[in-house]
């Protein structure tokens, strides 16, 4: 058996007496410093047998870093407001767009509260009127539209708004040169409200039209000149012109998903602070996914090519696994699941709805902008959604959106 030399014995005693986390009242960093200094009073052989002071400091440094990381993840949160200010400081967006987005987030908080209290506040059921699409307006549709419009007006940075619930675009400011154009669906999936199923708000923001200035001296605001009418019509821009887009989902938690053209970020409303807190960064949709989200109740009204596609998803052959079906009936809810898990969401044209049901300007285009920023694809079955030039505010188009491979697979069937 090998004998233990005096230097080694000294080293062992030194380690146990000085660098002992269990018995010492000093912090790990203080122990390490004391331990390292003590080495200089011993012979070289002793120092050689004692653990390296450099390794000691490295270990303490790593421990400190881990502790700091744990503390940061537990106590340091990044709110939507703080995140927007960082983007502004980095030059990604300007101060006016920051204000507009903050106003939209405020509207979403108010609508979230209304949705949660809908049954208590008697906001369920039908309003008794129909919107421009001929759909029965729910009470909460009307209230949500007022909330959204009011928040955007109060921002002082919004020139024109276009909503699902408004017949025509509305000029917000008397002079809207330099102010943003905001299109939105204040409450998507409102037919689900009575059953407490997920709903959401969708929005898109376009750049201001610097050539449009409304004359504030009009006695009758409804009488617009031909030039002013042209400015209002300029709301009809292709989705490729979008500066920002997002949606807010009102479900088991309230989630605000946003892109400003630099990736997709998700913020969750913390009920304790009343703030949207950053919870997901640079979201990427899977390239493929075995989930499809279609309303198969309309199957008989689809064309044969789409029927063939759907049949092959459900019965792909002996060597492949069939796709799973998930359908909520709320674009925001179905899209959010598709964004996270991959797959495809579709609302096709059929014998009853020649161009589908979803609106291009304030539903399909914003969602397609988001999915492309996440690495996915949005299509009408033949062309990119963001390339389509709207001809009217409430224009409808078929929508197929989700993982790139899944959307391209469908396009081959429809070609």
UniProtKB/Swiss-Prot annotation:
Where does the record place the region Involved in light regulation? 207-232
Q: What are the recorded Gene Ontology BP terms? A: fructose 1,6-bisphosphate metabolic process; fructose 6-phosphate metabolic process; fructose metabolic process; gluconeogenesis; reductive pentose-phosphate cycle; sucrose biosynthetic process
Q: What is its EC number?
A: 3.1.3.11
Enumerate the Gene3D superfamilies for this protein: 3.40.190.80, Fructose-1,6-Bisphosphatase, subunit A, domain 1
Pathways per UniProt: Carbohydrate biosynthesis; Calvin cycle
Q: Could you tell me which residues form the transit peptide?
A: 1-57
Molecular function (GO) terms for this protein are: fructose 1,6-bisphosphate 1-phosphatase activity; metal ion binding
Q: Which residues bind Mg(2+) 2?
A: 164, 185, 187
One Pfam assignment: FBPase_C
What is the protein's major site of localization?
plastid
| Up-regulation conditions | Light activation through pH changes, Mg(2+) levels and also by light-modulated reduction of essential disulfide groups via the ferredoxin-thioredoxin f system.
State the InterPro entries in the record: FBPase_C_dom, FBPase_class-1, FBPase_N, FBPtase, Fructose_bisphosphatase_AS
Q: Which cofactor does it need?
A: Mg(2+)
The protein's matches in NCBIfam families, at most eight in alphabetical order, are given as: PRK09293.1-1
Share any extra remarks. In plants there are two FBPase isozymes: one in the cytosol and the other in the chloroplast.
Q: Which HAMAP family match?
A: FBPase_class1
Q: How does it assemble?
A: Homotetramer.
Name by which UniProt lists this protein: Fructose-1,6-bisphosphatase, chloroplastic
